[in-house]
Amino acid sequence: MDICVRPVWAEIDLDIIANNMKEIRNLVGEKEIIAVVKANAYGHGALDIASTLLENGASRLAVAIITEADELRDAGITAPIMILGYTPINFAENLINNEIEQTVYDVEYAKELSDFALKLGKKAKIHIAIDTGMGRIGFLPNEEGLNKVLEICSLPGVEVIGLFTHFSTSDEKDKTYTYEQFSKLTAFNKALEDNGIHIPLKHASNSGAIMDLPETYLDGVRCGIISYGYYPSEEVKKENLKLKPALTLKTNVAFVKELDEDMYVSYGRTYKTEKKSKIATLPIGYADGYSRLLSGKAKVIIKGQFANVIGRVCMDQCMIDVTHIEDVKIGDEVILLGEENGLKFDANDMAEIMGTINYEILCMISHRVPRIYKKNNEIVKVRNYI
């Protein structure tokens, strides 16, 4: 793979991204779709997939931090971009001039943002967060919270674009708590409307709610993990969306050696050969996002067969046992995440080994790993981050 700076890469199929987004569009109808591209689009590369998302159903984007928004604006993305998290007030001018929509959950912050905007002769675009039960950020949906939001809505330098909350259990089979959260948001919005405040974009549905709870769609929805082809949990109704993972993580064999019986592999001597063995070294390790927790537990796909990761995963390398596979040589392609010939080892499988979720697996793929983008099975772009 000589178009990369190293023999480790992630392939992202833009056709699959497009199809996933079309599936979401078909499910939610004419509702606004806010495609969440934070954390480098969950490891898929925000700069290089944003246009595909927007061309196939998304009307807006959401990120977590201002540098993610700036990156998209600098790349020529003109669609509305929302920041879901905190932005220090010293970035106010940047927010306002680039028309980046900031989440607000503090009155004093909103006042400062309004003052900055007035000095620039503009308005700061904001979304107001309501904490209906996530316990993270947002105004509480009580009388005090209502008065604070009414005060923000009266500020001369802000334009309130949206009102939103975040569901904490929408991907679970029991939807009771999600319905409680939704009821709190809708009641809060009604109280605002009773006070003459009509916010144009109400949004609450995340991936789990998009799949299972169409009654929570409101004016728009926020899709994250489902855009990339993974379900938020095993408890959602998968039949509602036909998704396919868009990312495959690959490498090439860097070295092949034969070891006699009773020889050790990697740090700590945790693996000892039980017979004469053929061991292949792969040039990927935990600095690339291939976790040390996979040591002795993960599988890879090589030459249409599974091979086990043996010994401890190192910072930049790991080893696999290929004794049972014929003619393995330097340069052979290896799939670390993905599928081939009916064999599959994906982010769900890796997450189960590590005791985490598929989201984290995808986000762990580091900037040391180049991204290769394909359309119609042809490479259309390569992104080497470093």
Curated annotation (Swiss-Prot):
- Indicate the transmembrane segments per the record: none
First and last residue of the signal peptide? none
The UniProt entry's GO CC annotations, sorted and at most eight, read:
cytosol
The Gene Ontology biological process annotation of the record reads:
D-alanine biosynthetic process; peptidoglycan biosynthetic process
Provide the GO MF annotations for this entry: alanine racemase activity; pyridoxal phosphate binding
Family of this protein: Belongs to the alanine racemase family.
Protein's UniProt name:
Alanine racemase
**Native source organism of the sequence:** Clostridium perfringens (strain 13 / Type A)
Phylogenetic placement of the source organism = Bacteria, Bacillati, Bacillota, Clostridia, Eubacteriales
| Gene name in the database record | alr
